[in-house]
Amino acid sequence: MVLTSKQKEELNGSILDYFESSQYKSSFEEFKKETGTELDVKKKGLLEKKWTSVIRLQKKVLDLEAKVAQLEEELNSGGGRGGGRGRGKEDALPRPPEKHILTGHRNCINSVKFHPSFSLMVSASEDATIKVWDFESGEFERTLKGHTNAVQDIDFDKTGNLLASCSADLTIKLWDFQTYDCVKTLHGHDHNVSCVRFTPSGDQLISSSRDKTIKVWEAATGYCIKTLVGHEDWVRKITVSEDGSCIASCSNDQTIKTWNIVKGECLATYREHSHVVECLAFSTANIIDIPGSLLSTPEGKSKVKQGPGGNLVGQCGYLATGSRDKTIKIWELATGRCLATYIGHDNWVRAVRFHPCGKFLLSVGDDKTIRVWDIAQGRCIKTINEAHTHFISCLDFCLHNPHIATGGVDDVIKVWKLQ
């Protein structure tokens, strides 16, 4: 590339200024003599400015190239159903960049949860606090204080008027979300309480703990009405089926169990993971038929009562589980079979959620990625790399507004718009 006379003059002037400002006296005099260039105050710092501009432009080019590569991957990953083409609002997926980055917690984020009706969300942190945010504006609303140790999990009842939280301080707290007052503190677990979930009716609350038990509480009174025993180690997470009849739990003992809430009995135990099972989620009612599933045929649907635990667990459909073995497994509850194993995460899988449209599963993990899995194809169709600067610990869907939220060990929450 040949420089014009004006460009040469500008370059020589900026180099001369650089020699002078860096006190390279001999180089300054020699260069000035050879080029016949004089110092010009207008060119003060010009070389440094151009250099930093080039670096910024290089970074932008690299970012754009990465985005183009990701979009090309989406377009080539299977067309309308699983790929980037033909997707409507109901099956929109998260796309970078994030809409908001919410900062304020002083330690890692353990749980995020959207309010069922309003444009509010809550976050629970190792800093022993719960924070309330407006996820549309990205504004911080308030902090709920009461726990004396890390807040491990949070959940709303169906009305959004009651918030439950659980903590490493061995307690569960119920908060009136209209006044933000703590109205009840539940005692009963003997170790870190790691997960809490309301049943769909809101009448009962389910909790799991490092004490190896699951407890069922009466929300109105705060009384423990059942204790479910069966796991041999820390019960990490629990999830409740859409009809409220069945719960599933996962544990450090590398197993998943399903339970009859009414009878307090274990219905079935699932073993295929080779490490701690960190997370799990029941499928949505509108999930697509999974290839090889008993439920994918009319005849099979009539036979669900023959599965482990009988008709009750069979009616719950499918269960997704994520593990420290870096895999996600899809289980057919009617037969107890593992239908699919998703491989792609490079570290622990920390949270899984079925997309409300029933076609996709989303996951996050310690590899700092958000991944989208096409259930019909049984493969990852989208990856958001470096979604956080540290491990991603939690994920939630907003069911009334197309957003997801993620929380990480980097102490921040990110809100992502689905599009």
Swiss-Prot record:
LisH domain residues: 7-39
Q: Which SMART domains match?
A: LisH, WD40
**Gene Ontology terms: biological process:** adenylate cyclase-activating G protein-coupled cAMP receptor signaling pathway; cell differentiation; cell division; centrosome localization; establishment of mitotic spindle orientation; Golgi localization; microtubule sliding; phagocytosis
Q: Which GO terms describe its molecular function?
A: dynein complex binding; dynein heavy chain binding; microtubule binding; small GTPase binding
Name the CDD domains on file: WD40 (cd00200)
Location of this chain's protein in the cell: Cytoplasm, Cytoskeleton; Cytoplasm, Cytoskeleton, Microtubule organizing center, Centrosome; Cytoplasm, Cytoskeleton, Spindle
Q: Keyword Secreted on this protein?
A: no
Keywords (alphabetical) are: Cell cycle, Cell division, Coiled coil, Cytoplasm, Cytoskeleton, Differentiation, Microtubule, Mitosis, Repeat, Transport, WD repeat
GO CC aspect terms: centrosomal corona; centrosome; cytoplasm; microtubule; microtubule associated complex; microtubule cytoskeleton; spindle
Q: Which PROSITE patterns match?
A: LISH, WD_REPEATS_1, WD_REPEATS_2, WD_REPEATS_REGION
- Taxonomy, superkingdom: Eukaryota
The keyword Transport appears for this protein: yes
Q: Where are the WD repeats?
A: 104-145, 147-187, 188-227, 230-271, 272-341, 344-385, 387-419
Q: Where is the composition biased (Basic and acidic residues)?
A: 87-100
Please list where the region (Disordered) is annotated.
74-100
Q: Which residues form a coiled coil?
A: 52-79
Q: Subunit details for this protein?
A: Interacts with dynein and mtaA/CP224 in the cortical attachment of microtubules. Interacts with rac1A.
The task this protein performs is described as:
Positively regulates the activity of the minus-end directed microtubule motor protein dynein. May enhance dynein-mediated microtubule sliding by targeting dynein to the microtubule plus end. Required for several dynein- and microtubule-dependent processes such as the maintenance of Golgi integrity, the coupling of the nucleus and centrosome and dynein/dynactin-mediated interactions of microtubule tips with the cell cortex.
Q: What is known of its domains?
A: Dimerization mediated by the LisH domain may be required to activate dynein.
What does the sequence similarity comment in the record state about its family?
Answer: Belongs to the WD repeat LIS1/nudF family.
This chain belongs to the protein called Lissencephaly-1 homolog
Encoding gene per record: lis1
